Amino acid sequence: MRGQIDELDNQLMELLAKRMRVCREIGTYKKEHNMTIVQTNRYNEILEKRGAQASLCGMSPEFAAQIFEHIHEESVRQQLEILNQK
């Protein structure tokens, strides 16, 4: 069973890496179009949708919110790096 957990953890990391690649592409788009990095409405929409999804999957919405808050922080960090490049 530990092997299964390890494989799932690897898959999670690969998916997060893919998500961050897309976030960097979005960061480039935002830089080119003089947009702010944080889009509050979109962030709130994600938290709401993932909270509802967590409930359907037998997890607490608070758990999902914590995960996605950390994902969002890293996304913002990476997009800020792009924005600050000259």
Predicted regions and their residues:
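Domain-level signature for soluble enzymes in the chorismate/prephenate branch of the shikimate pathway
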Residues: 1-86
